[in-house]
Amino acid sequence: MSGDQYKIQDQNAYYFLTLTVVYWIDVFTRVDYRDVIVDSLNYCIDQKNLELNAWVVMSNHVHLVGRVDGGQGMSAFLRDFKKFTSRRIMELIDEIPESRKGWLKDKLSWEARRSRRAKN
C-alpha cells in the first residue's frame, strides 16, 4: 500500500490488502521472518478485533482479506501491524544467522529513512 491513492474510507469495512516489502526483497523466504507476520496476525485477531477471511504470505508480500470490527479500525491496525512487524524483522536480522545481513539492513534502513511516512 504505497502512496495516498487508496484511503481507508470505512474503518470497519472488508478490504483486500497487499503489503509489499520495499524493492520486492524476498524477506519472507526465511521462516523466522514469516513467523513474525503469522504471530502478529494471530495477536491482532485475539487483541485488536481483526477478522481475516483469507491471507497468504508470499516471498516478498502479504495479501489479506478482512476487516477490523470496532475498536480503532483498519487504519490503526495497519499502522500498528506494519510498525511492529518491520521493527521485529529488523531485530531478527541482527539476531539470527543471515547471509544477507548487511545488504538487507542497508536496503531496508535506507528506505525507512527516505520515507516521508516513517518516523524513526
Where are the language model's segments positioned?
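Short catalytic/metal-binding and nucleic-acid-binding patches
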Residues: 1-120
